[in-house]
Amino acid sequence: GATVAVHFINHTIATAAQLKQMLHISNDNYFEWRFGNIYYTKKGTGSPILLIHDTLPGASGYEWSKIEDELAIDHTVYTVDLLGCGRSDKSSITYTNFVYVQMISDFIKKIIGQKTDVIASGFSGSFVTMACHNEKELFNKIMLVNPPSLTQLKQMPNRKDRLLKAALEIPIFGTLVYHMIVSRDNINNLFIEKMYYNPFHVDNQMADAYYEAAHKGGYYTIFLYSSLAAKYININICHALKALDNSIYIVEGETEPNGKAVTDDYCASNPAIEVSVLKETKHLPHVEAPEAFLEQVKIFF
């Protein structure tokens, strides 16, 4: 009885989360990939730029909505929803860094079809660094927005992490725990505490899109979250970072926790990296200060 009740609660939450339909879907825009279909949009003309969102719960290509039209004036802008996120398939696999490295490389080869510039937000910076190290010929210039700490990326799953992953993936009850983690209040708190410099700037439509994306796909939304929580997506990128000779530019939010220490580590690994700090921003400078962010993009690309 309890299981049926919890299943009903889960279903109700997932359905309610998608009522606002913030994430528009056009059926032509799917890249059929071996682990699942990848949703993307393509806008504008000019040299290609690929936008890759962060991996926070509820993240999707919607993260770039405040800058993609402006970028499309001078570039062909490709915005993807990573596998396990947004409108892409929520596959029941263990998500690793290498899954995303392959996804990004295959997307560039099959859909973009030429060397591309890339802007990667948050944790996705690690995927792009590794993908570029593996297949340098696919990448032109790379912009990393608040990339993850090199120390954090070195942490590998231990026994406790593996148990956590298994517990989260128990059908129905794992989903209930996940729904608590990505509740509307928690998504709002994520924006207020972690994403924005000024909590009064929080964009409700952006929060709605995260809430909706976090619940799209029912039970299967848990697999990316469990892989992240249990550190399966971590990988040591120091060797790859040192070896890159592409132009790399880091945009850091002024109040991103440990932002300066993180960028100092990146620059120590690869002294050719340039850094720009955007004032009065935190984890999502391209959302909170789109004009200032676009200025940096124009300088770099």
Where are these regions (language model features)?
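Active-site loop/oxyanion-hole signature of alpha/beta-hydrolase fold enzymes
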Residues: 79-119, 295
